[in-house]
Curated annotation (Swiss-Prot):
It comes from the Eukaryota. Residues 1-113 form the Calponin-homology (CH) domain. CDD domains: HkD_SF. Pfam families: HOOK (PF05622), HOOK_N (PF19047). Belongs to the hook family. The large coiled coil domain may mediate homodimerization. The gene is hook. It is found in: Cytoplasm, Cytoskeleton. Homodimer. Interacts with microtubules. The keyword Cytoplasm applies. Cytoskeletal linker protein involved in tethering membrane bound organelles to the cytoskeleton. GO terms for molecular function: dynein light intermediate chain binding; microtubule binding. This is Protein hook homolog.
Length: 734
């Protein structure tokens, strides 16, 4: 295949940007330019072509046109050939037409064989395999055959004075025939003059006869030479028509014919001189023999006149033949022009059809462009409206989302508040019950405290009386009896007195503690009342929240502030409970000591006074009171546990609020992502607009180029129609 051989030949060049595997890869023109730069660097430049945007066929067509113009310039300047690449269609090459690519490769190969670097090209061809060499040699021979008829010099003819005229082969044949006719006429005239001179000199001298015979022989020789020259010219014409490839032979034949013609012309000039001399001699001889030869001369004149008439007729015929030949030439020229016009007309018709199709497509595209512009304007307006709506919708969405979230959170909080209210109601009921029990216990404790105070007062009075009696008895005993009584009083009564004093102190402390506990119970009752008041306020706030949903945030703030206040109250109560625990521990320690003392007293002999028995009873009563106080403390602890559970519920609400805050942050992140996505979409829209504008600009530039080409084609058609012979005149001038 010729395509594979062309691919191998192209890949044989060095320093190519990339090797090819298919001829369609040459459609962008870069590899063509690199090859041409290696073949003829005078006419080509590596940086003259575009290397970006080659996916567009318009840019590829511009590159191919640039290469074709440089190749045509090489053919014109280096080889003197015109219109060697006019048949190549650059648009088809840009659209990857293999036939047009092969034509351009053949033109570049012909340029390579005629360039200065043809030796390197031949070496590259010889380095290939035999099949590709044979294919390339066949292509080279075909290219040279197409170049040689135009490069061979036209044949030349000579006029009577020996001037050289450049003519075509047909014109040379006509000129040779005309020259032959003229030579025949001259020879006939010469023969007539010689005959007349011989007739005039027959009687005068034999020398003149011999000279005339010699002249006739020379004329016959000249005729033979003319015939031989005609034969040579015919042979040369045949050789010119057949052998157009061999320039050297044609130039040699031309030189030979020019030498022969020049020699013939010189011989003709010498013969004319001789004839003039003989005519002068004959005139002198005629002057002597006028009378004798008048009759013969008249006859000869008659013959000459008849022959002159024949010659004039022949000249007329020759003129008519020349005129007809000129007409034939003009007709041939016109036929050639018409043929070229027909060929060009077909090509121009095809181009016109293509351009008409393109113009129709341009019109459709213009309509589409207008529609697209209108659509773009409408889309732009729609996008602007949508962007405004988006911005508004985003604000509305954020507001709606925030409102929904607030409503949902408020609903959840309402449900929780309802549950908390239920629990608070239950707690309130429990607290009310516990308050009732506490009040009852308080009343009982107050009654016990009053009884204890009364008993303590009575015991103090008894102790004082006993103490006075003891002092008096001690004083009496000290005055009456001696040391045994003192020893008894010292051993038994003093210890009892000290113990009783201690018991009195402890009882006083217990009484003080009881008063403190009463104060604490009063504080607890006050806090209970405050809690009941707060519960009522929460119920009122719940009713207000059901009636008014717009003040939810404020209510939440109030709830949070109330929760904080409740927390603080719980902390304070915990502190109070801790202090109460400490006091209870101290009282328990004191009770343990009293119990130990009671055990010691029970172990001693039962010689107790009625006062001691009363003290023991009082002590037992105090223990009972202590047990009652412990029961109250337990009830207070239960209340504190309930308050702690409420605190836990409030802490759960806080955790839920924290989760809500996290959800809100997540929603804010989603909103940010949506805004980022909207910004990306805007950027993509802007990029799409810019790309559409670029494509429209490219289309407009392509349409403008097509319009310019159409106008150039019209101008060329107009110029060719006005000057029919301009094409041949250009060729002849070249």
């Amino acid at each position: 295949m010729i395509e594979t051989s062309f691919i191998k030949w192209i890949n044989s060049f060095k320093d190519l940007s990339n090797s090819i595997e298919d001829l369609k890869e040459l459609s962008n023109g870069t590899i063509f330019n690199e090859i041409c730069c290696q073949i003829a660097p005078k006419y080509f430049d590596i940086d003259s072509l575009r290397k970006d945007g080659l996916d567009n066929w318009i840019f590829r067509e511009e590159n191919i046109k640039n290469i074709v113009e440089r190749v045509d310039e090489f053919y014109i300047e280096e080889m003197g050939l015109n219109d060697q690449i006019s048949s190549i269609n650059c648009e088809e090459i840009a659209n990857e037409n293999i036939d047009e690519i092969i034509l351009l490769i053949e033109a570049i190969l012909g340029m390579a064989m005629e360039s200065e670097n043809n030796e390197a090209v031949i070496e590259n061809i010889l380095s290939l395999d035999q099949d590709t060499q044979n294919d390339l040699m066949v292509v080279v021979a075909k290219i040279q055959q197409s170049h040689q008829p135009n490069t061979v010099d036209n044949s030349k003819s000579f006029d009577k004075d020996g001037s050289i005229l450049s003519q075509s082969p047909s014109q040379s044949n006509n000129s040779i025939s005309n020259n032959n006719n003229n030579n025949n006429i001259d020879s006939s005239n010469i023969s007539k003059s010689n005959i007349s001179s011989n007739n005039n000199n027959n009687n005068s001298s034999n020398n003149n006869k011999e000279e005339i015979l010699n002249l006739q022989n020379e004329i016959e020789k000249l005729k033979r030479e003319k015939q031989e020259i005609q034969n040579d010219l015919d042979e040369s014409n045949i050789q010119l028509s057949n052998v157009t490839m061999d320039r050297d032979r044609i130039t040699i034949d031309k030189q030979k014919t020019e030498e022969v013609c020049s020699s013939l012309h010189e011989s003709i000039i010498g013969l004319q001189k001789q004839l003039d001399e003989t005519m002068a001699q004959t005139t002198t001889m005629n002057a002597l023999n006028d009378e004798t030869y008048k009759t013969e001369i008249n006859d000869l004149h008659m013959q000459v006149e008849s022959k002159e008439k024949q010659l004039s007729e022949l000249k007329k015929k020759v003129d008519e033949a020349n005129r007809l030949a000129n007409e034939n030439r003009s007709l041939r020229d016109e036929i050639d022009i018409l043929r070229e016009k027909a060929a060009n007309a077909e090509a121009t018709e095809e181009k016109l059809k293509k351009h008409q199709k393109k113009i129709e497509e341009i019109g459709d595209l213009k309509k589409k462009i207008k529609e697209l512009e209108d659509q773009n304007d409408s889309y732009i307006q729609q996008t602007l409206d949508l962007e405004e709506q988006l911005s508004k919708n985003n604000t509305y969405r954020t507001q709606a989302d925030s409102g929904k979230q607030q409503i949902s959170s408020l609903k959840i909080e309402l449900a929780k508040l309802e549950l908390s209210l239920k629990s608070i109601k239950e707690d309130r009921d429990k607290l009310s019950e516990s308050l009732n029990t506490v009040e009852l216990e308080r009343d009982s404790l107050q009654s016990q405290v009053t009884n204890l105070r009364n008993t303590i007062d009575n015991q103090q009075q008894e102790y004082e009386t006993k103490f006075v009696d003891l002092q008096s008895s001690i004083s009496l005993n000290s005055g009456g009896s001696g040391g045994l009584g003192d020893e008894v009083i010292d051993g038994s009564t003093k210890e009892r007195i000290a113990r009783l004093e201690r018991d009195n102190k402890r009882l006083k402390e217990v009484a003080e503690k009881a008063s403190e506990l009463e104060n604490q119970l009063e504080d607890a009752n006050q806090s209970k009342e405050l809690l009941t008041i707060q519960i009522k306020q929460l119920e009122e706030q719940k009713q207000q929240s059901n009636n008014t949903n717009n003040n939810n945030n404020n209510n939440n703030m109030v709830d949070s502030s109330e929760i904080e206040s409740l927390k603080q109250q719980l902390k304070e109560k915990e502190k109070e409970i801790s202090t109460l625990k400490r006091k209870l521990e101290e009282s328990n320690l004191s009770l343990d000591e009293n119990r130990k003392q009671l055990v010691e007293l029970s172990q001693r002999p039962t010689t107790q006074s009625p006062g001691d028995i009363e003290k023991l009873e009082n002590y037992e009563n105090l223990l009972k009171e202590n047990d009652g106080l412990e029961g109250r403390l337990r009830a207070a602890r239960n209340i504190i546990k309930d308050l702690r559970e409420k605190h836990k519920s409030y802490s759960n609400q806080e955790t839920q609020l924290a989760t809500k805050d996290e959800v809100i942050t997540k929603l804010e992140g989603l909103v940010k992502k949506k805004t980022d996505i909207n910004e990306d979409l805007r950027k993509q829209l802007e990029e799409g607009r810019e790309e559409s504008q670029r494509e429209i600009n490219l289309m407009l530039s392509a349409f403008l180029k097509i319009g310019l080409e159409m106008e150039q084609v019209k101008i060329q058609n107009i110029s060719s129609s006005k000057e029919p012979r301009s094409f041949l005149n250009k060729k002849r001038a070249d």
